[in-house]
Amino acid sequence: MASVFSRMSAMSLLLGLVACGAPIVNNTDPIQSKGVKVVTTFLPITLFTEAVAGDCADVTALIPPNLGPHDFQATPSDLTDLSGANVLVKNGLGMEEFLDDLISSADNKDLVVIDSSTGVKTIKAAGGGHHDDHHDDHHADEHHDHGHGHSHGEYDPHIWLDPVRAAQQVENIRDGLVKADPSCADGYKNNADQFTAKLNELNTEFTAKLKPYNGKTFVAFHDFATYFANRYGLKAEFLVDLPEMNPSPADLQRVAAQVKNSGLKALLTEPQEGNRSFNALAKDLGVNIVEFNPLETGSAESAKVPGTYFEVMRSNVNNLVKAIGD
């Protein structure tokens, strides 16, 4: 994958733009006009923002729904979208490592940036196929994005897969939109209340459904499920850190041993990944492949329906139960 710096340098030459390199300071002045234009980064952030915005704002995804943040390469039209936007909503925690350069090139001094991870309790990222089974006492507003190259940084960014943390993200989006566009404050608040209530119900449902499997281990293709696993008393293992990485022989041996020791009936694959090595490993071990969708990608239609989150997450839990077995 080309580096973010290389991609943005090439784009800057193409457009005749020069990135200023200065830190981005979020504008905090309220937007006075109607027709607020909100740009989101990738699928879960788009779903959460659509839920909160309702009829109050127009929401546009920066990354096409069929692409994940790892595969995104900015185009001139992306600069145009950011240049004309009032608000940008991101996941944070290094998930969108391309953003700083892109925002600088867009040169939109009035752009309000909402980091949905602010204040969310984080877990340190860990290579080598596992995480510690505890929560680190850090919150997302205590550090900056650390994404460089093929790494998300110090902290795991996949907070949206935990419904409790997802509710915090929704609240951050609500607060940011209310501050940016107070003319529709009641709408943002009511919409957010309804969505967070559903997230809380989902958490209650999952807690009951997964309680019999407390302490069980599951194996996913890439490192995305730690927050989810920690929420429900499970242990998450993974083959590779990032979806575009190729597993080493040591990775395959480690996962094979874990599958044999845990009695897993299936490995968890992802809809957007070919995972040929994962499929071959499952065949060698005599286990099945089932899908756990990390919601990094989806269809254009699903991205406009906030209920997609609940549908996919329920499917994930059903498949997870199949993978863990009795």
Describe the residue ranges of each PLM region.
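Extracytoplasmic metal-acquisition and chelation regions
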Residues: S3, C20-D326
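Bacterial N-terminal signal peptides
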Residues: S9-A19
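Bacterial N-terminal signal peptides that target proteins for export
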Residues: M1-A10
